Amino acid sequence: VYVTGALGDAGLALAVAGGKTTVPTEHHRYVQARLERPEPRIAQGLALRGIASAAIDISDGLAQDLGHILERSGVGVRLDVAYLPLSPALIASLNQDAALTTALTGGDDYELCFTVPPERIAQLETVAAAWDCRCTRIGAITAEPGLRPIRADGSAFFLERLGYDHFG
């Protein structure tokens, strides 16, 4: 399981707008831009044709949107939260657990989340080397259904919610 770019910045901007947190002055413009002017990963999405086995844009939060792939595919994922790509702004603004939670549930990032079979990883690495954004492996598909966020020490990382729910 892979993602493009950095996660959680738009969610951080929403939290700032709602008066729930603040960001250091030097990161304010960046965070606001990530919410107001997200960069759609169109070129990356097109490049993934024939490589990715499933893909979705992250609009409702990584956990929520990845959950759609898992549900439709009848599989699960071990999500290594230590590998989540976090921006310097997110790291400077929140404690570690809050930053990870925001990256997992924040929404409005419009990055891509996608799965790649093992036999196509080398092809992905070649293609992604030319991208103008990061491509980060964050986990692995499992036969056991469900989303399992795991810390570096192997313990579970618990989420109170998965992300934005349009019907909740």
Regions found by a protein language model. Name each.
Residues 1-46:
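Short, acidic (Asp/Glu-rich) active-site segment that either coordinates a divalent metal cofactor
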Residues 28-29, 50, 55-168:
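Glycine-/charge-enriched secondary-structure boundary and capping motifs
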